[in-house]
């Protein structure tokens, strides 16, 4: 069933990255980052479009050189999704991509340079109505902070962030969001909690360098889940050493699990045991692949026997409960006379889910499909 989340989100100010609202109650935006060579325009554009196809709201692109900045110009012309330029070391690159229509600038306080350079970036951003993300990272803190704290600590990440928030405040620039990422879950979580008490600007969440697809997804789910459950977070990125498309899928899965933002089908499936009347695991895997194109939020329960099947089906849009040779089918929690042959479950259930998705899409207000 389509249920609202009980989480009360932190109040924050509103900015826009392109046409995507961030903060002040807007849907939490899911983003990823390209891992192609930015100078390979064709490959980068293809990856951006692949990310957009699986639901990305925003895509970040690394722009390490002036040659990459020139490539960014071409990339921007060939894509429609809002793009963030990731800038390190050379502030002049930020000024260049601003000319080319970048939707947001990410700068790293640990390496972007002195206040005068930041001032140049801020004045350019103000003139061109471009928001900024202050992106603090536990792996690249300023030298004086490392000398002071000896290692990355929540207080060190907070001080780095607030140092640059204060600069933007002095420059009367409020169109920014902030992140304080770390690869350690507890370090990141505590840093974000401290920061959330200090500022009203939107917060971008992430566990940086989280790891490969499996371990990184788990680490991100634990860390971001703790923060999101506290109501903290306005955008997020799942950092995986994997195909960036997987980052978007995991991001939506986390939001879906917390009922914060639902996109696509939430499969409720048993791990299976000797009581299963059909192959639950292969059924779920096949349906997940076939139904990736559905964006309508739905709960579908697929349970291999009658122990928990009927109970889960009662609170699902569509439910399947394993039976001897034929499995029971539920629609909106009501058992139907129709039963599914256990040898043809995938095709039959796919057809029912697609038909149901069309019905659900019609009864849920259009604006809620993006929540």
Swiss-Prot record:
The protein's enzyme class: oxidoreductase
Pathway involvement of the protein, from the record: Isoprenoid biosynthesis; isopentenyl diphosphate biosynthesis via DXP pathway; isopentenyl diphosphate from 1-deoxy-D-xylulose 5-phosphate: step 5/6
E.C. no: 1.17.7.3
Cofactor(s) this protein cannot do without: [4Fe-4S] cluster
Catalytic activity: (2E)-4-hydroxy-3-methylbut-2-enyl diphosphate + oxidized [flavodoxin] + H2O + 2 H(+) = 2-C-methyl-D-erythritol 2,4-cyclic diphosphate + reduced [flavodoxin]
Keyword Iron: yes
Annotated positions binding [4Fe-4S] cluster: 270, 273, 305, 312
InterPro entries per UniProt: Dihydropteroate_synth-like_sf, Enolase-like_C_sf, IspG_bac, IspG_bac-typ, NO2/SO3_Rdtase_4Fe4S_sf
The record's free-text note on cofactor binding: Binds 1 [4Fe-4S] cluster.
Free-text function comment from the UniProt entry: Converts 2C-methyl-D-erythritol 2,4-cyclodiphosphate (ME-2,4cPP) into 1-hydroxy-2-methyl-2-(E)-butenyl 4-diphosphate.
Membership in a protein family: Belongs to the IspG family.
HAMAP family noted in UniProt: IspG
Protein name, UniProt field: 4-hydroxy-3-methylbut-2-en-1-yl diphosphate synthase (flavodoxin)
Organism the protein comes from: Shewanella pealeana (strain ATCC 700345 / ANG-SQ1)
Name of the gene this protein is made from: ispG
């Amino acid at each position: 069933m389509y249920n609202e989340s009980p989480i009360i989100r932190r109040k924050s100010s509103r900015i826009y990255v392109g046409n995507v609202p961030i903060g002040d109650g807007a849907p939490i935006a899911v983003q990823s980052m390209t891992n192609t060579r930015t100078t390979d325009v064709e490959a980068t554009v293809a990856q951006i479009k692949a990310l957009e196809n699986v639901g990305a709201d925003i895509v970040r692109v690394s722009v390490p050189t002036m040659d990459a900045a020139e490539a960014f110009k071409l990339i921007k012309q060939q894509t429609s999704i809002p793009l963030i330029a990731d800038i390190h070391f050379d502030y002049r690159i930020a000024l260049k991509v601003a000319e080319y229509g970048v939707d947001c600038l990410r700068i790293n306080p640990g390496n972007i340079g002195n206040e005068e350079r930041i001032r140049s970036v801020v004045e350019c951003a103000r003139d061109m109505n471009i928001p900024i993300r202050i992106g603090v990272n536990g792996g690249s803190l300023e030298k004086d902070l490392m000398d002071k704290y000896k290692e990355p600590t929540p207080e060190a990440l907070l001080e780095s962030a607030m140092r640059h928030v204060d600069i933007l405040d002095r420059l009367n620039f409020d169109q920014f969001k902030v992140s304080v990422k770390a690869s350690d879950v507890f370090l990141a979580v505590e840093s974000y909690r401290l920061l959330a008490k200090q500022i009203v600007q939107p917060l971008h969440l992430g566990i940086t360098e989280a790891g490969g697809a499996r371990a990184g997804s788990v680490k991100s789910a634990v860390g971001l889940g703790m923060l999101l459950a506290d109501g903290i977070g306005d955008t997020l990125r799942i950092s995986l050493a994997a195909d960036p498309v997987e980052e978007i899928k995991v991001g939506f899965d986390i939001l879906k699990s917390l009922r914060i933002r639902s996109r696509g089908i939430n499969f409720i499936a048993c791990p299976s045991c000797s009581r299963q009347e059909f192959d639950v695991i292969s059924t779920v895997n096949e349906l997940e692949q076939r139904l990736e194109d559905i964006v309508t939020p739905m709960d579908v329960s697929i349970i291999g026997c009658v122990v928990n099947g009927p109970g889960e089906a009662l609170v699902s849009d569509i439910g399947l409960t394993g039976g001897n040779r034929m499995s029971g089918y539920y629609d909106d929690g009501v058992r139907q006379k129709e039963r599914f042959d256990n040898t043809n479950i995938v095709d039959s259930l796919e057809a029912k889910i697609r038909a149901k998705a069309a019905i659900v899409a019609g009864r849920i207000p259009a604006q809620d499909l993006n929540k």
